[in-house]
Amino acid sequence: MVDVPYDRIADIPPAEVPDVELYHPRSWWTRYVFSQDAKVIAIQYSLTASAIGLVALVLSWLMRLQLGFPGTFSFIDANQYLQFITMHGMIMVIYLLTALFLGGFGNYLIPLMVGARDMVFPYVNMLSYWVYLLAVLVLASAFFVPGGPTGAGWTLYPPQAILSGTPGQDWGIVLMLSSLILFIIGFTMGGLNYVVTVLQARTRGMTLMRLPLTVWGIFTATVMALLAFPALFVGSVMLLLDRLLGTSFFMPTLVEMGQLSKYGGGSPLLFQHLFWFFGHPEVYIVALPAFGIVSDLISTHARKNIFGYRMMVWAIVAIGALSFVVWAHHMYVSGMYPYFGFFFATTTLIIAIPTAIKVYNWVLTLWHGDIHLTVPMLFALGFIITFVNGGLTGLFLGNVVVDVPLSDTMFVVAHFHMVMGVAPIMVVLGAIYHWYPKVTGRMLNDVLGKFHFWVTFLGAYLIFFPMHYLGLLGVPRRYFELGDAAFIPPSAHSLNAFITVVALTVGFAQMVFLFNLVWSLFEGEPSGGNPWRATTLEWQTPETPPGHGNWGKQLPIVYRWAYDYSVPGAAQDFIPQNQPPPTGAVQGVAP
């Protein structure tokens, strides 16, 4: 720790911060529709992602109805079931979670948390949302074309993805790949904005080691996405060329419908490498912003400094780097060179080390804290419990010997949903409860919020713990109907019915949450400027919700790190980052 006198701290510039003239909206259209304000763009991203996410939620209910009560619902057939799987998975992983964490929280929080007036490139930021919206519309249009959306599975493996026997082989796969290409273009415009804003638009005194961990998580995830998404982009373009022009990048010589196909010489394994080189970093593109947000929620609602701030930062960076050398643990049964499995199993276990550091630091932050069991805190605790449980099952799947018999069973589905479904959604919900007062100026209803949490949290475990057991029994995933297979015990059918009932109940809780959002917007209690008594800059704006340009006439000056809670001798139990020190005081640049 290096001590620097306060009168010098304000003169430490992390970057030049010119007070540029902002674009000022001149009409309702330029203020709320074609807005260049990052806060409005964040809300647009969030609403669009939530809308398409509701579609994915409905698809999951339809799949559960079929699995729980097979043959009861005649409007669901085998082809549609495969299409539902594909669309549900792709929407949740990319169009919902990536868009919410980076496009939603990233746009709203980065400028406020670093003390900037807006993103560095507001016009490009606006374009990024509209390209994302176009990608969502192209994806959704697949429901309305002949043949419907593709049923190739959300990983889109060739040759199945473009063979004539696959549902949605005509327009469905073309629209899916086109939508992915558009999404990546839109994200690249937004992602460059996030990175440049963090590096170049921080206010005076905001050194990198004073950034809130939310910003560190979003920043690192964005850098990862800018490196990982090109692999998916290239794979999507090449697969689209295979489908439309008859090239054979990924299509081997094979017999299709009794005749030798027009393809030959391609490698399906190459596509799997490209997809998972994107796919596993994508897990942490979603997880790292969640890690950062949870750190801020825990510190704020436990009224305690985050434990091991620098270690937490370096753990985020280490996870981001290691995530690029573990992708092939998704391919143990793909036919790749067997000895590669030992390398990727080793790197998979190594990445657990920085992840464990974060978990221990969260626990130590809670230790002897003044814990307030607010709704955001409940969701943060729910995330930690869920992520640890999901991570422990990941240790099984990271081991080659164990993964082979569990591959393509419901165990994989349960693990993936705990880590990439329930855990990040817990963070999204906790973050909404936490920052909703900043966005709207009103508090969400606490009773409805706690009802929402407990039904969601307990329901998730009642869904996915039995699903792990089904996987251990050997119940396969992606089956439209299990039938009377000898290796499936009768208890599996009863468990599937139980899981379906619980899933529908959890879905009802999300409707209560939506009601809470809308009702509180008009009838919620006024929040004031800083209802959680938080230290970070977004809570120190002169207006709530923040006005155009965020900071009025003068940008804030940062004097301390982001987690000054329960400071001995202080007038209150928190000290905001922009609060000037007493005359002659000395403060460290970073903990």
From Swiss-Prot:
List localization entries. Answer: Cell membrane
A Pfam match is COX1
Q: Which residues cross the membrane?
A: 40-60, 90-110, 126-146, 172-192, 215-235, 274-294, 313-333, 337-357, 377-397, 412-432, 453-473, 498-518
Q: Name one GO biological process term.
A: aerobic respiration
Q: Where is the signal peptide?
A: none
Point out the cross-link 1'-histidyl-3'-tyrosine (His-Tyr) in this chain.
Answer: 280-284
Mind telling me which PROSITE patterns this protein's record contains? Answer: COX1, COX1_CUB
Where on this chain does heme b 2; high-spin bind? Answer: 415
Residues annotated as binding Cu cation: 280, 284, 329-330
Catalytic activity reads: 4 Fe(II)-[cytochrome c] + O2 + 8 H(+)(in) = 4 Fe(III)-[cytochrome c] + 2 H2O + 4 H(+)(out)
Q: What is its EC number?
A: 7.1.1.9
Keyword list (alphabetical) reads:
Cell membrane, Copper, Electron transport, Heme, Iron, Membrane, Metal-binding, Respiratory chain, Translocase, Transmembrane, Transmembrane helix, Transport
Q: Which Gene3D superfamilies match?
A: Cytochrome c oxidase-like, subunit I domain
Where is it found, in Gene Ontology cellular component terms?
plasma membrane
Q: How does it sit in the membrane?
A: Multi-pass membrane protein
Against InterPro entries, the record matches this protein to:
Cyt_c_oxase-like_su1_dom (IPR023616), Cyt_c_oxase-like_su1_sf (IPR036927), Cyt_C_Oxase_1 (IPR000883), Cyt_c_Oxase_su1_BS (IPR023615)
Tell me the residue numbers annotated for binding heme b 1; low-spin: 88, 417
GO molecular function terms listed in the Swiss-Prot or TrEMBL record: cytochrome-c oxidase activity; heme binding; metal ion binding
Broadest EC class assigned to this enzyme: translocase
Q: What does this protein do?
A: Cytochrome c oxidase is the component of the respiratory chain that catalyzes the reduction of oxygen to water. Subunits 1-3 form the functional core of the enzyme complex. Co I is the catalytic subunit of the enzyme. Electrons originating in cytochrome c are transferred via the copper A center of subunit 2 and a low-spin heme of subunit 1 to the bimetallic center formed by a high-spin heme and copper B.
What the record says about family reads: Belongs to the heme-copper respiratory oxidase family.
Matching entries from PANTHER family are given as: CYTOCHROME C OXIDASE SUBUNIT 1
Instruction: Describe the subunit structure.
Output: This alternate cytochrome c oxidase consists of a subunit I and two cytochromes c. Equivalents to subunit 2 and 3 are not present in this complex.
State what protein this is by name: Alternative cytochrome c oxidase subunit 1
Look up and give the organism this protein is from: Bradyrhizobium diazoefficiens (strain JCM 10833 / BCRC 13528 / IAM 13628 / NBRC 14792 / USDA 110)
